[in-house]
Design a protein with these regions (language model features):
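Glycine-rich loop(s) and the adjacent beta-strand/alpha-helix scaffold that form part
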Residues: 74, 78, 86-88, 270, ...
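Cysteine-centered motifs
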Residues: 10-13, 30, 38
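Conserved redox-cofactor binding core of oxidoreductases
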Residues: 156-277, 283, 346-367
Length: 585
């Protein structure tokens, strides 16, 4: 493995603050997680950063790891991958339920905050983003959702030629290995997608019964041909451990002599000769260094950082650049614009039946699930907290699903803006039902706040800015009302823990959403694909308009938000982007 620097992220298996299992079992789990153990990893085959490379990929996240594998597989090209965070040896990354810890860990998480939003009762939002090899896919809730066919057909309609559903479906099928609950395998791709419907908590049956009572569809998978309806979510795991892009793609790529990974590298700006990108200026080991690319520089730093790097390099709205003392290279007003994100809300209830709280809270339960995980890699620790849900139409007149629902057999308390380092199940049985409108129409911005590349960005989501988005919130709240009011779920409700959605009118649903909703961690669109610089940032081949040798490959190029979780389409996009890059080589 060629690696310029390895930073050890986890120094103690018994990390304080995450209290689902006792320390002794934390240590057992760490020791069993051999691929992600807390033992010190030595540096090997250290390579000088002054060496020339064909491709420099900035960001070893969900997209960057895929690119590294695909661009290096032929052996023709030398690939350098830069990551601002650490290598990601933490066992909390490997353990599926461990994201309760990484969600707040500043060693693994940028922990961004948005500007306060009047539309959300003056609140600032907490935006966790991965600062580690594997990116946000290393700290997310693992749900694997391709998106709906119309999402990608809309991409093409918006100017992203060649990104329609028929095309991207083939990329998904190439990329995936789908693992059935009985051990059957479909496909032969490096990314494992696990059916865990046989492991979910028994209380989920009340959700399925409620959906059936309302006449809502049932489906085996939101990723299948019939993807509308109640289902157990599929997740990215293999052998009971997280299967993120680093494990699936980068790990095998690093065995090749033509791939180098540098961690702890902060990209500062892109260097140009005329309008051609030729190098990237970075801060590495306390020194400013310049890394040259013989062919292309590829930004894969995500929807928050990719537009910032362009702006810091002189590509962005000219008045913004001038206001921060940056000499404009190209006036590109769409850089940082078109920001979209899912907003969601949870309704918490005390339950009349045992839930996951009864398993994860008491000491005996912690011991039992820890042993189950250590011995069989199964059970609650091998799952996401988001066990069930699906895509739904809020009313029969809708032609497409407009809501994504979540049903979680556990309740827990956190504090705003990531201030709390403990995620602890409540000391009574409880469950959560929540929703997110699938396709918001509001558009925000992400911009630099300074010419200092280390300064926090200015994130302005512009949430609920359209009447359509507000109507979709009410529709989602009404759908949850109907579900909770069914005989099946009403039997499960002991009492409410939040404002009781069951008695709310439309205005009250919207007001409650404004007061309590939060991001579902799916920001996209800030370097959107399109035909020209007049309507977008990159071409359908992901080349920055008007610039040579520079592409953006991550969720920032999505013309519109996909209907569900965004990690799967981000990896798909990178997989297909690699084909385009190699065609142009």
């Amino acid at each position: 493995m060629r690696e310029a620097k390895v930073k050890e992220v986890c120094r103690s298996c018994g990390a304080p603050g995450f209290q689902i299992f006792p320390r002794i079992y934390q240590k057992i789990i760490c020791l069993r997680s051999a691929s992600f153990s807390c033992q010190k990893h030595s540096e090997s085959h250290q390579r000088t950063p002054l060496e020339n490379f064909d491709y420099i990929i900035v960001g070893a996240g969900s997209a960057g790891c895929v690119l590294a594998e695909r661009l290096s597989v032929s052996g023709r090209f030398k690939v350098l991958v830069l990551e601002a965070g650490g290598r990601g040896w933490s066992p909390w990354i490997a353990l599926p339920l461990g994201y309760g810890k990484t969600f707040f860990d500043p060693k693994l998480n940028w922990k961004y905050e948005t500007e306060p939003e009047e539309a959300l009762a003056g609140r600032a939002g907490y935006w966790p983003r991965g600062k580690v090899v594997g990116g946000s896919g290393a700290i997310n809730a693992l749900v694997y959702a391709r998106g709906l066919p119309r999402d990608f057909d809309d991409w093409e309609a918006a100017g992203a030629n060649g990104w329609n559903w028929d095309t991207v479906r083939r990329t998904y099928e190439t990329m995936e290995t789908r693992l059935g609950k009985n051990g059957e395998r479909k496909g032969s791709g490096p990314l494992h997608v696990q059916d865990v419907s046989d492991q979910i908590h028994p209380v989920n049956r009340f959700f399925f019964a409620a959906a059936e009572e309302l006449g809502l569809p049932r489906t085996e998978s939101i990723n299948g041909p019939d993807n509308e309806g109640a289902t157990a979510y599929q997740i990215n795991t293999s052998g009971g451990m997280r299967m993120h892009s680093s494990r699936a793609f980068l790990k095998p790529a690093l065995k090749r002599a033509n791939v180098t990974l540098m961690t702890g590298v902060q990209a500062e700006r892109i260097i140009f000769e005329g309008t051609r990108a030729v190098a990237i200026q970075v801060m590495y080991e306390g020194k400013t260094q310049t890394l040259r690319a013989g062919r292309e520089i590829i930004l894969s730093t995500g929807s928050v950082t990719s537009p910032r790097l362009l702006q810091l390099s002189g590509i962005g709205p000219v008045e913004l650049l001038k206001s921060h003392g940056i000499t404009p290279l190209m006036d590109a007003p769409h850089v940082g614009g078109n920001l979209q994100d899912h907003l969601g809300i949870s309704y918490n209830f005390r339950a009349t039946k045992p839930t996951l709280n009864n398993v994860l809270r008491p000491l005996t339960g912690k011991l039992r699930v820890a042993l189950q995980y250590v011995l069989a890699r199964r059970g609650p620790l091998a799952l996401s907290v988001n066990q069930c849900g699906g895509y739904f139409r809020s009313s029969q007149d809708k032609t497409q699903p407009d809501q994504q629902l979540y049903f979680n057999p556990v309740t827990y308390t956190t504090t705003p803006n990531g201030k709390r380092t403990v995620v602890q199940p409540d000391p009574f049985p409880g469950f959560i039902i929540g929703f997110q409108p699938t396709r918001p129409t509001s558009r925000g911005r992400i911009d630099i706040s300074s010419s200092d590349p280390f300064a926090a960005p200015r994130i302005c989501p512009n949430s609920l800015a359209t009447a359509e988005d507000q109507e979709q919130v009410v529709a989602g709240g009404r759908l949850c009302q109907r579900l909770i009011s069914t005989t099946a779920l009403n039997e499960l409700v002991a009492s409410t823990m939040d404002p009781d959605v069951r008695g709310m009118n439309d205005d009250e649903i919207l007001a409650d959403f404004r007061a309590r909703c939060g991001t579902v961690f799916h920001p996209v669109g800030t370097c959107r694909m399109g035909q020209t610089a007049q309507d977008s940032v990159v071409s359908p081949r992901l080349q920055v308009h008007g610039i040579q040798g520079l592409r953006v490959v991550d969720a920032s190029v999505f013309p519109n938000l996909t209907s569900g979780n965004t990690n799967a389409p981000t990896m798909m996009l990178a997989h297909r982007a690699a084909d385009l890059i190699l065609e142009d080589a």
